[in-house]
Amino acid sequence: MNIGRFLLEKKYQLRGETNRTPPYSYTKLCKELVNIKELNSLTLSQHSEEKNINKKRLLIRHDIDHDLWTAEKMAVIESKYNLRATYFVLHTAPYFKKKFKETMEICRNIQSLEHEIGLHNDLITDFFMNNLDPGGNLAELLILFKEEGITISGTASHGSPIIQK
């Protein structure tokens, strides 16, 4: 038996029934969300600036811990349905350092779809593991993004397992 196929089938086994595809799709979810009347899709920064607290709001946040390429696909789907999201890029993730140029290109693509980019900061882990000063590290990261034409709209703490020990 093909182990990959077995794992896929095991992953999507619901109440004893095996489905060869997940019981949902992100496209289907987005399609359902846009059918909600008077729902206003905002990025996190747009939400913080919004004054009318009586409006229905949808805030989508993605922490890109592992798979930048799937995040880009999700951004395209959201854009198709006129949904906005905030994508937090993890600067300590393997994709960030090993594929920096591609990471920046994908961030620009996501940003061009009217989503925003934030920093999924892991500054304390960088301090303990690599002896990098958090303030200086943050300043360097912000300069890197700015030089690549990417606006960083905010930050979200990563909560690395290394720090949680």
Language-model region placement:
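Glycan-processing catalytic domains of CAZymes
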Residues: 118-120
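Terminal accessory/targeting
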Residues: 1-61, 65-86, 90-104, 108-114, ...
